[in-house]
Amino acid sequence: MLLPSDVARLVLGYLQQENLTSTCQTFILESSNLKEYAEHCTDEGFIPACLLSLFGKNLTTILNEYVAMKAKETSNDVPTIMSSLWKKLDHTLSQIRSMHSSPGFAAHQRARTRNGIAEIKRQRWLASQAAPVSSELLVLPYASGQFTTSPLVATQAVKPTGPISTPVRSNIVVVNQSQPQSTVTNTAGESLNIIPGPQERKTQTSLMSPGRRKSESQKKSLTSSGPHSSRNFQDPNAFAVEKQMVIENAREKILSNKSLQEKLAENINKFLTSDSSVAQVPKQTDSNPTEPETSIDELLGLPSEIHMSEEAIQDILEQTESDPAFQALFDLFDYGKTKNNKNMPQISSQPMETNSNIVLPEETNLTIKSSFETEESDGQSGQPPFCTSYQNEDVLLNDLKSGNSHDVLPQESQENFSQISSNIQKKTFKTAIPAEQKCALDITLESVSNLSDFNQRGSSAECNEHCSELFASQIPTEAEVAVGEKNSLSADILSQSQYQPDQPSVPVTSFVSLGGETNDKNLVLSGKNSQLLSQSTPLTTKPSKSQLCENSNNIIKVKTNPQASESADSSETANRKTETNTVSPAAAQPQADCQDNSPLQSKPPPGIGESLGVNVTEKIEIHLEEPAPSDKQLSNDAASVDLNPTESKTEPLQSASAQEPEPPSVKDGDTIFLSLSEHNSCEEVALVLGEGNPVKNNNSLSSESGGSVGVSPETQNTDGKTSNSTEVDASSIVSLKIIISDDPFVSSDAELNSAVSSISGENLPTIILSSKSPAKNAEFVTCLSSEETASAVVSVEVGDSGSMEQNLLVLKPEEPMVNNTQNEDGIAFSANVAPCVPKDGGYIQLMPTTSTAFGNSSNILIATCMTDSTALGPTVSQSNVVVLPGSSAPMTAQPPQQQLQTPPKSNSAFAVSQAVSPNFSQGSAIIIASPVQPVLQGMVGMIPVSVVGQNGNTFSTPPQQVLHMPLAAPVCNRSIAQLPIPQKSQKAQGLRNKLITGKQVNNLTNLSSLSEACHTQRTEASDKNIATELGKKMEDTTISLSGERVAPPSKPFESHRRVLCFDSTVSSVANTQGSLYKMTSENKEKKEASFSHLDSPILSSTLKPPPNNAIKREREKTVPKILSKSETASSRHTTVKEVQSEKKVSPTEVALESLHKATANKENELCGDGERPKNADTSKLPGGQQNGSLRNEKAIASLQELTKKQATPSNNKNATSVGGTVKDQKQEQSKPASSLIGAEILQDVPIHSPANRSADTDLPVPRTPGSGAGEKHKEEPSDSMKAPASRRCGEEGSMPRVMIPPVTADLPACSPASETGSENSVSMAAHTLMILSRAAIARTTATPLKDNTQQFRTSSRSTTKKRKIEELDECERNSRTSGKNLANSSVPMKKKKIKKKKLPSSFPAGMDVDKFLLSLHYDE
């Protein structure tokens, strides 16, 4: 507070300052406030020693400051702080703008969004593992699509459907339909696919007016419950007029009823507000990552609902469904299927959503469907069962999905099927099955009037046109297809007609049951058709035998449609049909079984059961069934036969019965034929290969056996015949069945039929392959016959046979695929082969490796028929076989042996298809050891490809040419996968054949023994003959291989055969692997059992099978130690590592040596060095050596780059240069003991070297790129090292990784490094090193992994480098000691299994390396 005295003093000070002495004196004297100063005032008027300032400031200063302040107040000067803040803001904004404009940022953002979405989808996949198989099927069908784009859609669609098996089915149908118009499907499917099914549904609606949109979502939910066409209701035009009317009525109701609209909007808004913003942005980014702003605006403006999360859509649907106000609306769409619909809406909503994905294309698809129907009608006396079958299939699928109201559903499905059936029967077998037809038809008409309309419409020219197109491209003659269908159908239907009256209520039921969970139940029922129902019982009431028969009949009808469909729209139709038709064939088989109430009859149900059991998600299984109809084409059966030669032998009758619903006359004798329908020999044996003759009969019948891949051991057991079916664990069996729509050929060629009958894949999700061209159809049929495994072509799209290898292999697994892969089946990848493959008739046939040729049920064999061969005739089919080892390492190992022996026992292996085998031999077989990383050149997916042999038939003739280069992988688990990579093998098929004969045979032998070991390992319990011998060795190898390599060796045919061996994710499949392995092993066991003899000669000569067995046993003993090592080495990827080491060690040491030396020097090097860059490695390895030299060069270059980047020659084995690794491997492999050590070292090199490298070089970032996809997904080097191929398969199988072209192998690695940053990479490397060191310690101490983990955690703080160096040394020493220990130790397979189990606990199957490391809680 300023006092007057202060002011006076300030004034006084001013006066003094101005030297106004007189004024000062006067002021002092006169001022009442300055009296004290007056007393001391001097004469001059100055106050001595007095401060006349205020706070040290005199009046002038104060005034000046005040003036300045006032001036500032009046001025607009911006504070410096504000200006700096503005500058910062401006800079930030400019940065944001530049980032948006920069492609790198957009790509990064896109990648992050995609990765996030992929991760979410992958998690969903994992969560929905119950229905993953079916989703796999979905993916496969998509892939089956005739256009490359379709696979993309399929992949995405698969993701959304992954969680829901039923939706997947629906999606498949939709995809198939849309596939004809691949462009539309891609466009709509791709962007929509990203959105979960419900969202997709929304997409459709979003395109419509707001009122319509609302009604559409409701309609979709309604339609989803209804048949597929109903679901595709966005394009009501495509559906029957009645359906259109229903939709129109529903629309009018919604539009005219404002309360409904309000409620709909209310329901949507409830969830939209919370979900749309979040879901829309990522979705938008996903669809239009480059232009997020516009895309956001567009998406928000036009189809905001599209971007609603699946959950939100689902919630809205549920809300709407639960709202009684909408009951009338739903009733409109029910068409007597209300019960089913009610059950299905939730389930089907997702499927519907998926369908929505393809909704826009669906109109066209529907049109195509109609065309198919019409065409089929033309071909099959104008029956539109095709479309109907689709719809029925949808309904059936929905029913299956809903899994409740089984009776009702079956009825509904029955009706649908009946309708189809009736159409087919009327046209094809009008007189044959009038009563049955009537029953089914009536039901169909009653409950499926929509379907009926759709069928009618299908008959319309529109359908015909589409069908014509599809048929033209896929089937030489629609009439032929129709004939083929008719033939098989007639047999089926005849048998049906005989039993259809009984079955009328069951057809759908059977179907459903197949889709549902036939697997073990069917086996139980295997005695009767009702067995089939039994399996389907969950879905439908267990029908009596007659019921089953009826079901069979309906299914058969559906089959007929599917077959026609398959022929016409093989890829889409086949896919779709595969889903449904698989079931139908299964049903048909039961029907045939019903006809033959003998073992055969019981067998088909087992087949179905197995297929379902295998699938149970068993949609795949159903697909297997579907192939049965295709089998009619013989191709299915042939594929089955091929797949199941061994099992067929074991279960010939079963196979035969499954196969031959065709000839009603063929009863028990032909029972095999009847069996064809599900070819209960779902197990490999299910194919009645053993019953070569019956199988042949079936084939001639146009066995529908196509299918029953993966009959559960029960089924086989049920089949008195199939002791070989080896007690395949039905639960562990996942069957993939490929249905080929080359019915005409199947029916026309008895040989093809027999081949088809011989095919049976235990663990094969059904894949429907359609011939791209008519000529191809015949060829394709043959191929399928030879390798119904082709049915395993889960996602492989059959394309140009020659180029198909590569194109086919363009598997484009997505996250969902990875999940699929996780599905015990290698099929999981449902590699979406770019339909580009459809050359002239080349088809990619995924043949269950479990089948004869490929001893692993998990494995999938993709066989393509070359068009040229097709030209020769239906029998003549050059087939490329791709073996996708689901996650069963056994597959690779066993088949090679079998294949090696297959030529001699071709009949056995490919009993029926032997006759066809010559044709197949024209085809080339590609064995892809590592499903994930290796990529066929033409393939988008990473499918290791190797030329198996000229023999197109995987199962048929001599495996002499089986290029098991990928099989070298057994030595290096990863290497194998990489070896098969070269798609170029096709070009060098001749070379490869020659090479294969010399080199390949050794590789094959190794692989064979390895495969056998693998198969045996997992299947040891089930197959004790060979399982015990091989099993012990295989046990070691199998677990280590985790099915990676098993598939490649599975096809040692001379003809140029390409077998794609897809290895299911090792890490993600870590847990699944157990079951997969088991399933695969069981299948393999069967194959081994069958092929052990076949392969023995070759193996003995090359590998000395007895020594192999001994080695296997030794290795089995040693394996535990290896496991310990690998576990210690990398607790996370120990499983893969273990698999790797076991593989490497397990295969005959010499064989491995020779394999690595001869074929896998680079491979090994790549494997060891570039296991990380799986894709690159894959490209280099198998094919790279011979035809994949370019690939090898590329891979080597990439590897070298990696090594340079890694700058980590830390491991001698891992010599920075591939050469170094190769040298080490060579040196180690040169000696028998060294071979084991070499295998282990290879193991260690890839396993430890990468991690060690990163640790030693402290260049984790480079190494991360080097590690490739493995590192990308599991940024931990140890993981990639652990099982590059295996994990590749697992991760890439389920992730887009597989889709990444071979060259992109490094890409994934780079992206993680760039995204994560070098620091993260270093930390990851440190984590990996710690894990590896712990693994090394564990190896040295042979202590359990858990203990090692604890030790490692405690000692993790110890110097990493020291540990890394020690680890490298230890790894080498351990690998050597482990090799010796392997020979000496007698750890049983169980131990190994236990360890494997432990490993998953340490490194969960679904967990990424990063997550796993994080879960370790290292305190570094």
UniProtKB/Swiss-Prot annotation:
<dbReference type="GO" id="GO:0045944">
    <property type="term" value="P:positive regulation of transcription by RNA polymerase II"/>
</dbReference>
<dbReference type="GO" id="GO:0005654">
    <property type="term" value="C:nucleoplasm"/>
</dbReference>
<dbReference type="GO" id="GO:0001701">
    <property type="term" value="P:in utero embryonic development"/>
</dbReference>
<dbReference type="GO" id="GO:0044843">
    <property type="term" value="P:cell cycle G1/S phase transition"/>
</dbReference>
<feature type="compositionally biased region" description="Polar residues">
    <location>
        <begin position="220"/>
        <end position="235"/>
    </location>
</feature>
<feature type="region of interest" description="Required for acceleration of G1 phase">
    <location>
        <begin position="628"/>
        <end position="652"/>
    </location>
</feature>
<dbReference type="InterPro" id="IPR052850">
    <property type="entry name" value="NPAT_LisH"/>
</dbReference>
<keyword id="KW-0832">Ubl conjugation</keyword>
<feature type="compositionally biased region" description="Basic and acidic residues">
    <location>
        <begin position="1270"/>
        <end position="1279"/>
    </location>
</feature>
<feature type="region of interest" description="Mediates transcriptional activation">
    <location>
        <begin position="263"/>
        <end position="339"/>
    </location>
</feature>
<feature type="region of interest" description="Required for activation of histone gene transcription and interaction with MIZF">
    <location>
        <begin position="121"/>
        <end position="145"/>
    </location>
</feature>
<dbReference type="GO" id="GO:0015030">
    <property type="term" value="C:Cajal body"/>
</dbReference>
<feature type="modified residue" description="Phosphothreonine; by CDK2">
    <location>
        <position position="1264"/>
    </location>
</feature>
<keyword id="KW-0010">Activator</keyword>
<keyword id="KW-0539">Nucleus</keyword>
<feature type="compositionally biased region" description="Polar residues">
    <location>
        <begin position="179"/>
        <end position="190"/>
    </location>
</feature>
<feature type="modified residue" description="Phosphoserine">
    <location>
        <position position="209"/>
    </location>
</feature>
<feature type="region of interest" description="Required for acceleration of G1 phase">
    <location>
        <begin position="822"/>
        <end position="847"/>
    </location>
</feature>
<feature type="modified residue" description="Phosphoserine; by CDK2">
    <location>
        <position position="1096"/>
    </location>
</feature>
<feature type="region of interest" description="Disordered">
    <location>
        <begin position="1348"/>
        <end position="1400"/>
    </location>
</feature>
<feature type="modified residue" description="Phosphoserine; by CDK2">
    <location>
        <position position="773"/>
    </location>
</feature>
<comment type="function">
    <text>Required for progression through the G1 and S phases of the cell cycle and for S phase entry. Activates transcription of the histone H2A, histone H2B, histone H3 and histone H4 genes in conjunction with MIZF. Also positively regulates the ATM, MIZF and PRKDC promoters. Transcriptional activation may be accomplished at least in part by the recruitment of the NuA4 histone acetyltransferase (HAT) complex to target gene promoters. Required for early embryonic development.</text>
</comment>
<keyword id="KW-0804">Transcription</keyword>
<feature type="region of interest" description="Required for activation of histone gene transcription and interaction with MIZF">
    <location>
        <begin position="5"/>
        <end position="25"/>
    </location>
</feature>
<feature type="cross-link" description="Glycyl lysine isopeptide (Lys-Gly) (interchain with G-Cter in SUMO2)">
    <location>
        <position position="1144"/>
    </location>
</feature>
<feature type="cross-link" description="Glycyl lysine isopeptide (Lys-Gly) (interchain with G-Cter in SUMO2)">
    <location>
        <position position="1274"/>
    </location>
</feature>
<feature type="region of interest" description="Interaction with MIZF">
    <location>
        <begin position="1"/>
        <end position="319"/>
    </location>
</feature>
<feature type="region of interest" description="Disordered">
    <location>
        <begin position="1089"/>
        <end position="1190"/>
    </location>
</feature>
<dbReference type="Pfam" id="PF15712">
    <property type="entry name" value="NPAT_C"/>
</dbReference>
<dbReference type="GO" id="GO:0003713">
    <property type="term" value="F:transcription coactivator activity"/>
</dbReference>
<feature type="region of interest" description="Required for acceleration of G1 phase">
    <location>
        <begin position="1319"/>
        <end position="1342"/>
    </location>
</feature>
<dbReference type="InterPro" id="IPR031442">
    <property type="entry name" value="NPAT_C"/>
</dbReference>
<feature type="modified residue" description="Phosphoserine">
    <location>
        <position position="1249"/>
    </location>
</feature>
<feature type="modified residue" description="Phosphoserine; by CDK2">
    <location>
        <position position="771"/>
    </location>
</feature>
<feature type="compositionally biased region" description="Polar residues">
    <location>
        <begin position="1376"/>
        <end position="1387"/>
    </location>
</feature>
<feature type="region of interest" description="Disordered">
    <location>
        <begin position="1202"/>
        <end position="1234"/>
    </location>
</feature>
<feature type="region of interest" description="Disordered">
    <location>
        <begin position="179"/>
        <end position="236"/>
    </location>
</feature>
<feature type="modified residue" description="Phosphoserine">
    <location>
        <position position="552"/>
    </location>
</feature>
<feature type="region of interest" description="Disordered">
    <location>
        <begin position="1249"/>
        <end position="1297"/>
    </location>
</feature>
<feature type="compositionally biased region" description="Basic and acidic residues">
    <location>
        <begin position="1154"/>
        <end position="1177"/>
    </location>
</feature>
<feature type="compositionally biased region" description="Polar residues">
    <location>
        <begin position="1205"/>
        <end position="1219"/>
    </location>
</feature>
<keyword id="KW-0597">Phosphoprotein</keyword>
